[in-house]
Amino acid sequence: MSYKPSAKTEVRRNRYKVSVDADEGRRRREDNMVEIRKNKREENLQKKRREGFNPSMASQPGQDFSSSLPTETRLENIQQMIAGVMSEDRDLQLEATASFRRLLSIERNPPINEVVQSGVVPHIVQFLSRDDFTQLQFEAAWALTNIASGTSENTRVIIDSGAVPLFVKLLSSASEEVREQAVWALGNVAGDSPKCRDHVLSCEAMMSLLAQFHEHSKLSMLRNATWTLSNFCRGKPQPAFEQTKAALPALERLLHSTDEEVLTDASWALSYLSDGTNEKIQTVIDAGVIPRLVQLLAHPSPSVLIPALRTIGNIVTGDDIQTQAVISSQALPGLLNLLKNTYKKSIKKEACWTISNITAGNTSQIQEVFQAGIIRPLINLLEIGEFEIKKEAVWAISNATSGGNHDQIKFLVSQGCIRPLCDLLPCPDPRVVTVTLEGLENILKVGEAEKNLGNTGNDNLYAQMIEDADGLDKIENLQSHDNNEIYEKAVKILESYWAADDEEEDIGGVDAPENVQSSGFQFGNQSGNAPTGGFNFG
C-alpha cells in the first residue's frame, strides 16, 4: 500500500482549509451541542400555572358561577361571569373574577382560549389598579397569571391590555400575596419569548423584582421570585446585560439557599448571565459565585448540579485568568467526580466540554488537570463512552496536545490516548475527525523531536504506536474523505511522518521503476521506465 498523496489530493490542494488552531481550542457553546439544556425543568417550566388551592386571600365560593361544575357547564355560565366582572357591584366583581380564576385553575385543559375569546381580559386587567380592593387585585392577578401560562397569543392579549406595568406596580403592594402573584405573572409573561421578556424589563420590572429578596421573604415568594428572575435572564437574543447584571448580588446570596428549587433557578440564571463575552464572564466572577458553584457540583440533585456545571463551563470559555479562577476554587476534583461516577450522559458530556476548555489554557493549567487525576478517566470515556461523550472528550485530549509541552504530551501517550484517538478516525463527524487528527499530529511532532534528539534511535516511536493501533491505515483512508480539511490534514501527516518509509519501499522493490521521482505514483508491476520528470497527466 502506498501512503503517498493520491492524484485526487494534488488536485484538491488549492481548496485547502485551515485546520483547528490554538484560537479555536477554547469553545463557546454551540447551539447544536446543548442537549443538556433539554431537561424537563429547563424546557417545560418556562411558564407555570397556579392551580386551585385556596390561600388566605382567595375568595371562597359564595355566589359561585363555576365551582364544582363540569367545564362545559361552566363555559355556559361565562356570560353571567362577564356580567359580574362588568358590574358596578364590588361583591359581584370579586365573585365573578374568582369564578374566572377557578375556571382557569382546573387541573387539566383549562379553557384559556375560550376565556380570552370572550373579551373579558381587558376588564380583569383593570382590576389590577384597584388599590382600594386588595382581594380583587389578588384574584385578578391569579386569573391573568394562568392566562399568561397559555400560548403566545394568550400572553399577547395580556400585554396588549396593559397588564405588565400594573403587575410591576403591584410589586410594591402592601400585601405579600398580591406581590407574589404579580411576581408569578411577570415570570409567565417574560418566559413566553425574548420579545415579551424585553417588554417586561422595559417596564422596569428588574429592580422591583429584586426588592422581593430579603430576609423576611416567605419560601414560596423566594421560589417564585427566583424562577421569575431566571426568566428575566434567559433566552436568545439575550437581554441587555446592563439590565440583568443587577441581579448578580441577589443570585450570589440565593446560591446559599438550602432549597432545591431556589438553587436550581438561581443557578440557571447564572448560566444565562455567564454565557457571553469575557466582559460578562468577568462580571459574574466578580460577583463571587464561583466557590459556591463548585460546591454545587456535588449536589445530590441533577436539577441543581446541571446548571451549576453549565455556569462553570461558561466561565472557562473565558481567558486564562478567568479559567484560573475556576481552577483555584478547586473545581477539578468536582469535575473528576462527574467523570468517574454514574452520572447520565448529558452530565458527563458537559463535564468533558468544561475540561476541554481548561486544557485549552496554558501549560500550568494543563498540568493541574493532569495532577487532578483527570486524564485516565477522560481517556476511559474516549474508549468506552457513548459517542456524544467521546466528541467532547477528544477535544479535551486534543487541546492538551496543542497547548502542552513535550513532557505533558509524553504523559498523555503513557496514559493510553493513542489507540482511542485512532479508533475515532472513521467516525462520521468531520469535526471530530479533524480534532482527532490534530491531536495525533501533535503527538507525532513530539515523537519526531525525540527521534531527532537521539532518544529513540532512528525511529519515531509514536508513529509506530499509531501504526500498531491501525491508525496508519485509517489516516491513509482519509485521503479519499469528502471534507477538504480532513483529507489535507491526512496528507500532511502522511507526507511528514511516513513518506520516507514509503520511498524506501519503492526503492527496494524488485519491480520499482528506476527513474520515478519520489513524488510520483506507483501503479504496480511495470517494466517500462517512467519519464525522468515523472508522469504528465495533463
From Swiss-Prot:
Biased-composition ranges, Polar residues, are 56-69
* Name of protein: Importin subunit alpha-6
Q: What InterPro entries has UniProt attached to this entry?
A: ARM-like, ARM-type_fold, Arm_3, Armadillo, Importin-a_IBB, Importin-a_IBB_sf, Importin_alpha
In its UniProt entry, the species of origin is given as Arabidopsis thaliana (Mouse-ear cress)
Q: Where in the cell is it found?
A: Nucleus envelope
Question: Which parts of the sequence are annotated with region: Disordered?
Answer: 1-69
The alphabetized list of GO BP terms reads: protein import into nucleus
Q: What does this protein do?
A: Binds to conventional NLS motifs and mediates nuclear protein import across the nuclear envelope. Acts as a cellular receptor for the nuclear import of the virD2 protein of Agrobacterium, but is not essential for Agrobacterium-mediated root transformation.
Which keywords does this chain's UniProt record carry? Nucleus, Protein transport, Repeat, Transport
The ARM repeats lie at 109-149, 152-191, 194-234, 236-275, 278-317, 320-360, 363-402, 406-445
Q: Which domain of life is it from?
A: Eukaryota
The IBB domain sits at: 1-58
